[in-house]
Amino acid sequence: MIMKRILTILALSLLCLTSNAQLVWKISGNGTKKPSYILGTHHGCPFTYCDSIPGLMKAFDKVDNIIGEINMIELAEMSPERMQKMQAMMMMPADTSLLSLFNKEETVKVNAWLIKELGANLEMLSMMNPMTIMVTVQNKVMMEVIPDVADMTTIDKYMQTLGQSKGKTIGELETTDYQMELLYGNSLEEQADALLEMIDLGNSKELMIQLTDAYKSQNLDTLWEIFQEQMTGYEYDAIVKVRNLNWEKQMKELL
């Protein structure tokens, strides 16, 4: 049975629930026997920032369970079969052309943007589906803003690894399969529309810099404003709205 004292680690998509200038929230009252805590994290922020989050380690010492967005320890031990399944979801189906998802005007727009961002056009990226292209560009932007992001230990992984070393139970609110379905579950046409919307939004690098700075300064009002600017409608529904509702239900059961 899951113990009642829990530290739940969630990505920034949870931050829309509050405007308080803090990253750790205490959950108590309303029938709960022992307090639990929520930690808001940023995947582009290294674990060394934990020392700058007031109350984090005190909360960590009080809990018996660490519940993450996903289990980062299991993710590092993913089987080759699961990796192949994920890679297949990122590719265009053999019977559909990436170019067929865009009209002539859209193709010109997408190609100009892709050449600027990735040095390639739709024809050169023909094996990728639109969502994979979006993720690739977003990862590139993050690496430009945070050059060592690929090698660093994130806050999520650090807290789970530390928890495991202290004998705490490690759990998750989502599986990687569920997250992949969130990203790639919509039709190719909807993914293409989301890509066009991402191009129209622009300023992704500047927004990533602002997002990281706002997180480090724990300015949640600014974080939420940036999220609203940066996210397409497709991303907001999939990454924030639906997941927050699911997390709320699960957290009530855990508490």
Predicted regions and their residues:
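Structured, acidic catalytic/metal-binding patches in enzyme active sites
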Residues: 23-242
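Positively charged n-region of N-terminal signal peptides that target proteins for export
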Residues: 1-6
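Hydrophobic h-region of N-terminal signal peptides that target proteins for export
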Residues: 11-20
